[in-house]
Amino acid sequence: MSRIARLSDVLINKIAAGEVVERPASVVKELVENAIDAGAGTVRVELDGGGVDRIIVSDDGHGMGRSDAVACLERHATSKLRELDDLFHIDSMGFRGEAIPAIASVSRFTLHSAAANSEVGTRVSVEGGGPPLVEDAPPRTGTVMTVEDLFFNVPARRKFLRRGDTELKHAEEAVVRLALAYPEVGFFASHEGGTLFSSAACPDDPRERIAAALGSTSHPHLFPVEERRLGVAVTGFAASPEFTFNNARGLYTFVNRRYIRDRGLIGTIQRAYQDFLAAGRQPVVVLHIDVDPRAVDVNVHPQKQEVRFADARGVQEALTAALSRMLRAAPWLGSGVEGAAPQAGQPMDAAHYAHAVERFLTRAQEAAWGGPLPTAMDAPGPGPGAPSLGPLGQGARPGALPFAAAVGQAPAFGQAQPQLNEAPPPGYFGALRPLGMLGGRFHVCEGPGGTLVVMDPHAALERARLTGYLRALESGKPPPAPTLFGTTLELPVAAAKALVEGREALSRLGFDVEPFGGTTVALKTVPPGLEGADARSLLEALARALPPKSATLDTVSLAEAVRVMACHAAKQAGAVPLSDAQFRALLGELDRADFHPTCSHGTVVVLEMPLLELERRAR
């Protein structure tokens, strides 16, 4: 008797399921990809029990007649390949013909579809890879696939599934990845009736889709990137270094619209950002890499999440060029978005300090003297304290002046160092004599010895609030009596989950946040100074800033969250110009605050122009 036997189709499909179907998220990915390949304009995903109990994926694509509906359950039956050469020109999401029979072999599977203009549809039901039950069904547009009781007949696999909320998180991420790859397709996902993800088709502004995935506050921080070279094109959006996460979950790379988790690509992105981010922060990018299908092999990973490039170095060089160009240009500095700089206490990138100083000086001086800053050709040479840009100097805008060259050589406490080591004399701010405002934004004062002092009140407010919140946290005492807020907000599932898991940290900071069902949270109280803040923007920013659940709650782990609080408190307080009394109160706060030359976004707080420099210009 022969010892080698041919495996049954049922067993073959279950073995294939071990590679293709890892968890509910794998099923979601495969079925949604089929919907996209069918030309769907809208895809809906409904989940129960984290996707273990039920997954329903419906689309409005081409649909299938009876013969195709039955054939798609046969292993290696596919509409994407006809001959060997097709394998090297793949432009569809699926192509192997393994996914549906593998899924049907480990679940209770139902397919309902109809060909276009058909008067009757088809329903095919399969239980655990058994024989299909084929019957007529009402006609419909597109296809609905239902997967129930995943791994019900493979208990060894089912016991390795995680808790429902963990599986749900992976399933939602599968939807998000495909939604980011196809902004022209509408995506709607729900779990037991509660919305997980909702985004209508937005082909004209993919940033709307990114904002739906990462939170509405991401939109103004996203900037286009593009690099086209022979054989490769890199397009997409990258966030300013101020909008970051504490993990790599904001890194999305797609190759020919297929989500790829490639170490080489991720490393290239991180290296491009490394001089712009504070320690422990990760960039946010959504990048599409388009190459000739013949120059990339997508058939090297069961879930197709890894690829092999014919010219990996060329792809990485194009990616580096696209990101470096955007980061050097620093478009956020002129976009109304507070710019990029490390957190307080972190070394500031010299190039970005130069950008921030140049922007501030230009606005202040043009308002005061009606003329542009001198160029590097007619400015005096930098003083001994001027920053040396060194290897980062190429990031500075051409013609940008070192701080000392712009304000003269006389020593002034805010002039030369990207990070100051010495604070001004005690009582310095309280002794300033307010003179008025410039451009509806900057406050102008007379300082000691007739020095002209120009202050950005928003940056100053943020610096003062940051000191207050940090000192309250360092004291170990409960925060001051919080203010009743009383609002409910539906947030992205990741943000809602982070806030609920971080309730202890939020309580330390003076917030009371409670789950309110689904992805809705109730914000009951906020710390003093945040009473009028935009609740949605504040909570989404806090969700990104909170430390992991395992972190010790101290001033180090909570520093980013405190920075977010200070920023939003300053936005609220500075929404309208400060009155004379409010500005004098701010000067008193600055005398009591820990001095730093910039706010946490890199905006310069205060500038001095010595009397000698004014006299020189008046000649």
Curated annotation (Swiss-Prot):
Example of a GO cellular component annotation carried by this entry: mismatch repair complex
PANTHER family for this protein: DNA MISMATCH REPAIR PROTEIN MLH, PMS, MUTL, DNA MISMATCH REPAIR PROTEIN MLH1
Protein name: DNA mismatch repair protein MutL
GO molecular function annotations of the record: ATP binding; ATP hydrolysis activity; ATP-dependent DNA damage sensor activity; mismatched DNA binding
Assigned protein family: Belongs to the DNA mismatch repair MutL/HexB family.
Biological processes, Gene Ontology terms: mismatch repair
KW DNA damage (keyword) present: yes
Gene3D superfamilies xrefs: 3.30.230.10, Histidine kinase-like ATPase, C-terminal domain, MutL, C-terminal domain, dimerisation subdomain, MutL, C-terminal domain, regulatory subdomain
Its job: This protein is involved in the repair of mismatches in DNA. It is required for dam-dependent methyl-directed DNA mismatch repair. May act as a 'molecular matchmaker', a protein that promotes the formation of a stable complex between two or more DNA-binding proteins in an ATP-dependent manner without itself being part of a final effector complex.
HAMAP family assigned to the protein according to its UniProt record, in alphabetical order: DNA_mis_repair
Pfam families attached to this UniProt entry: DNA_mis_repair (PF01119), HATPase_c_3 (PF13589), MutL_C (PF08676)
Segment forming the signal sequence: none
InterPro entries, A to Z: DNA_mismatch_repair_MutL, DNA_mismatch_S5_2-like, HATPase_C_sf, MutL/Mlh/PMS, MutL/Mlh/Pms-like, MutL_C, MutL_C_dimsub, MutL_C_regsub
NCBIfam families, alphabetized: mutl (TIGR00585)
Keywords assigned by UniProt, alphabetized: DNA damage, DNA repair
